[in-house]
């Protein structure tokens, strides 16, 4: 039997609400596709001047729905928006100006918004993208030739064009609060060139398929992410910069718990415009394969005025990675004025994500436990770094039989100037705690690096450092 729910349209004016009248009938049996009915309800509210669309308990099977200015979508407890597993139910954006490297952003999503203002998604309900089933359908349709993906990744045998859970492009005054969000086919929540964005109290469980980032903020201004729980098969909370003429500016990430098969909080790797005035604090990290904090500026952008403090990371592959690189040809990056303080991290001997269904890819060489690298490139140093009140416990147990880079050969560590940035990118390193290279002005204050077992390497190795203070 087809179940239905009556939607009431409410106009929000200040603290008051005005009932506009009867809404539309939307199936919520979880089997009947209701994309058209949901879109009709959203559009009707927009045409009335704005208001709230409340979804009662039930399951709403839908393809892509587009948010409109002035509309709040509220999911009551027990309400689930369930993404269709048919890729034909999703919009595909192919505009060449979507980003400097558009292959990484499809613009396709379950919840889509373009150029809207004053939009909110709230409630105690759930949005489920059914990402695994959707991704496998996309993969099958590519191989049958029905929907070929021109950028199909044959090395990893998976499609690149997969819908995100959210995609908001050039939007203003956006709030997303309290919802449970899960199982995207691609990235999770994507906000591109948006302004005045608030994400709070979210539970993001995005482990359905490869490249399942949790939250991606791309060249946005005035962003607040707070009190969120994120479990992602790729980066947890990731700031990206795809637009050379823009940057992420005035972004705060606060009081979040993150578990990741990649890095917990990451800047990059896309870094065309850069990251400025970013504040990350009070973050708990656990069972994370790569870095607790990764700051990467490698595509010619400018990264400036970064403050990271009060980070508590357990069972995490690396505490900190800061990298200035040059993937963008002649255009050099700038990375300066970075403060990391009150960071604690426990690095295990084995894989932090050993019990995950989707695990991060291993490197293809033998190595001992990696130190935390902070590395610029020749002629382009990272500038003005402060590490203060840092505690990192390493497992030790390094052996020369596994891998050996003696101090007298530290000049043989490859620069990897134009390579993909990752804390493992340099191969075996000659230290166990910190590896510092090509830096102008770095201060280490109250640094406590410890070993659970012996390690034959020195704690810190530095090369090409101008202005080194250690106290």
Q: Model-found features: residue ranges?
A:
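Extracellular/periplasmic carbohydrate-active domains that bind, remodel
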Residues: 18-471
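Bacterial Sec-dependent N-terminal signal peptides
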Residues: 1-23
């Amino acid at each position: 039997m087809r179940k239905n729910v009556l939607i009431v349209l409410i106009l929000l004016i200040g603290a008051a609400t005005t009932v506009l009248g009867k809404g539309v009938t939307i199936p919520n049996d979880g089997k009947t596709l209701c994309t058209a009915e949901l879109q009709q309800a959203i559009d009707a509210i927009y045409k009335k001047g704005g208001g709230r669309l409340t979804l009662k308990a039930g399951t709403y099977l839908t393809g892509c729905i587009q948010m409109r200015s002035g509309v709040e979508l509220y999911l009551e407890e027990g309400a689930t928006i369930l993404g269709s597993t048919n890729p034909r139910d999703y919009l595909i954006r192919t505009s060449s100006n979507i980003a400097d490297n558009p292959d990484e952003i499809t613009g396709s999503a379950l919840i889509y918004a373009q150029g809207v203002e004053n939009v909110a998604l709230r409630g105690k309900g759930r949005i489920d993208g059914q990402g695994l089933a959707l991704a496998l359908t996309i993969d099958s349709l590519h191989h049958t030739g029905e929907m070929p993906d021109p950028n199909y990744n044959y090395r990893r045998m998976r499609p690149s064009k997969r819908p995100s859970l959210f995609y908001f492009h050039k939007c203003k005054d956006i709030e997303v609060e309290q919802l449970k969000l899960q199982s995207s086919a691609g990235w999770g929540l994507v906000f591109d060139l948006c302004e005045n964005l608030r994400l709070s109290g979210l539970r993001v469980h995005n482990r359905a398929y490869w490249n399942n980032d949790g939250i991606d903020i791309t060249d946005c201004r005035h962003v607040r992410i707070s009190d969120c729980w994120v479990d992602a098969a790729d980066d947890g909370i990731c700031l990206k910069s795809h637009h050379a003429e823009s940057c992420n500016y005035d972004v705060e990430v606060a009081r979040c718990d993150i578990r990741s098969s990649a890095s917990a909080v990451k800047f990059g790797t896309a870094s065309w415009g850069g990251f400025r005035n970013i504040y990350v604090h009070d973050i708990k990290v656990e069972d994370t394969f790569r870095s607790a904090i990764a700051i990467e500026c490698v595509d010619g952008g400018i990264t400036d005025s970064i403050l990271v403090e009060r980070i508590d990371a357990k069972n995490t592959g690396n505490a900190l990675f800061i990298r200035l690189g040059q993937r963008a040809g002649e255009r050099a990056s700038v990375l300066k004025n970075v403060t990391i303080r009150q960071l604690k991290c426990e690095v295990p001997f084995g894989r932090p994500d050993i019990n995950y269904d989707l695990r991060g890819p291993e490197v293809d060489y033998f190595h001992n436990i990696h130190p935390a690298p902070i590395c610029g490139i020749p002629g382009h140093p990272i500038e003005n770094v402060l590490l203060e009140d840092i505690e990192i416990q390493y497992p030790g147990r390094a052996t020369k039989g596994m891998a050996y880079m003696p101090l007298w050969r530290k000049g043989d560590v490859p620069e990897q100037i134009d390579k993909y940035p990752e804390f493992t990118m340099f191969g075996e390193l000659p230290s166990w705690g910190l590896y510092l290279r090509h830096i102008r002005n770095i201060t280490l204050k109250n640094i406590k690096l410890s070993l659970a077992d012996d390690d034959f390497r020195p704690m810190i190795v530095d090369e090409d450092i101008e202005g080194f203070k250690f106290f």
